[in-house]
Regions:
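Flexible coil/turn and secondary-structure edge motifs
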Residues: 1-118
């Protein structure tokens, strides 16, 4: 099992999106934080998933398509748009998903990849 966390809107709404996906074992909702300037608490969900069933790229794409990823927000916002990684090796795949979504949508995407701290 692997973990990722996602933020971008109300954690109650985000929780249901990920719970419906095959390969997602558990979704915990609450507040997450990263390093400065994103070190304030923001609403988010922690997703535990089986990478042999659902890939990190798929989870990232679902996240980008189900909240306002193209809306600029403060990094200190309660609704910070982010993909929080638990391992450094997850960064590249998450960044590729964001770049692909930006290319497809033709819009600037304001979702950032951040290390999960708590």
């Amino acid at each position: 099992m692997e973990k990722l966390a996602f933020g971008g809107g109300c954690h109650w709404c985000t929780e249901g999106v990920f719970q419906a996906l095959r390969g997602v074992e558990k979704v915990d909702q609450g507040f997450v934080q990263s390093d400065a300037p994103a070190d304030t608490w923001a609403e988010g969900v922690i997703v535990t998933f089986d990478p042999s069933v659902i890939q990190l790229a798929t989870l990232s794409e679902v996240h980008l398509r189900t909240h306002s990823a193209t809306r600029a927000r403060s990094p200190r916002s309660k609704y910070r748009s982010a993909i929080y990684i638990f391992e450094d090796r997850q960064r590249h795949e998450a960044e590729l998903a964001i770049a692909g979504f930006a290319h497809e949508s033709g819009d600037a995407v304001h979702t950032v990849v951040l290390p999960f701290r708590s």
